[in-house]
Amino acid sequence: MRSQVIEYPMSLVRLAHELPIEAPRTAWLDSIIKGDCVSALERLPDHSVDVIFADPPYNLQLGGDLHRPDQSMVSAVDDHWDQFESFQAYDAFTRAWLLACRRVLKPNGTIWVIGSYHNIFRVGTQLQDLGFWLLNDIVWRKTNPMPNFRGRRFQNAHETLIWASRDQKGKGYTFNYEAMKAANDDVQMRSDWLFPICTGSERLKDENGDKVHPTQKPEALLARIMMASSKPGDVILDPFFGSGTTGAVAKRLGRHFVGIEREQPYIDAATARINAVEPLGKAELTVMTGKRAEPRVAFTSVMEAGLLRPGTVLCDERRRFAAIVRADGTLTANGEAGSIHRIGARVQGFDACNGWTFWHFEENGVLKPIDALRKIIREQMAAAGA
């Protein structure tokens, strides 16, 4: 998968404005579209991307020069693309690109927007006003932030990410909870993430040794975002592509990407960077899932498959309680009938019970949980493409 550039208006492949509204995926998938993000997004089909990562201009122009204690100059963001006449102008810009993003986002898709205190609250307001539903705010704590050289404020050591679904009804969005938990030593992943800023060999430099892009994000940050909220084969959109971190990480992790960028030097750097990436293999990309992600199996399916017969006696692993399987898929015990969960709870005097793990059947003198039979059904469903 080599990245192609759809230049706007001069093209190495095709002109962005030549892309029909219902352009086939191959016309823009794994591509960098050159141009203004709003205009370029208008050429993509409705509901065509799974996840959006947006790193918009922060509007953080600094007044005057900044110097370190040794009087060396601090390299601040002074690019023209980060300049806005007023908050109103920035709000109008934000609303325009968010509206365009919302149209191309799938109903079950999600968007991530990163920013600093200069802009993230204004972005959050626009997200809510446009109908997006906020899922989390994530704090990226920097292990090596820039000091506050003037000593007039706290050291700014974090940036904020907002994660949102397309709307409140956007059910079924991807969140790889089990994978995130396993990666965090089997503890729930928190909403504060600790990563260093992009430095060293990862930082793109030009022939003079200067930074290619002033706000290049670390690949580890994008990798966590994609591993948390997407699946292999999903389409990741970055409307402010910059140096191509999103594309590089997407390619490595087996996701598709589409980037939008108007500055040719950034496009050149991103293209070379992405073309040098080697994708991981299928085994390395398999996402860990939990039971909530597995297909639902009714207890009657176990009986219909002939794995249990009416009249079978089930018991708990210590043989303290027993119940009889009935033909209709219910259990009966102590004169009461109900589901495997209800009867499991009733015999123990509990309010709830997982009947799949509580009830056991005997095979060759060995007790086994009926959950083992459910696993067989799920394997059959997977083999049949269910």
Swiss-Prot record:
InterPro entries: DNA_methylase_N4/N6 (IPR002941), DNA_methylase_N6_adenine_CS (IPR002052), RAMA (IPR040843), RM_Methyltransferase (IPR001091), SAM-dependent_MTases_sf (IPR029063). Its EC number is 2.1.1.72. It catalyses: a 2'-deoxyadenosine in DNA + S-adenosyl-L-methionine = an N(6)-methyl-2'-deoxyadenosine in DNA + S-adenosyl-L-homocysteine + H(+). Keywords: DNA replication, DNA-binding, Methyltransferase, S-adenosyl-L-methionine, Transferase. GO terms for biological process: DNA replication; methylation. GO terms for cellular component: cytoplasm. Coiled coil: none annotated. It holds the Pfam family N6_N4_Mtase. Residues 280-382 form the RAMA domain. It comes from the Bacteria. PANTHER family: RNA METHYLASE-RELATED, TRNA (GUANINE(10)-N2)-METHYLTRANSFERASE HOMOLOG. Belongs to the N(4)/N(6)-methyltransferase family. CcrM-mediated methylation has important cellular functions. Contributes to the accurate cell-cycle control of DNA replication and cellular morphology. This is DNA methyltransferase CcrM. It comes from Brucella ovis (strain ATCC 25840 / 63/290 / NCTC 10512).
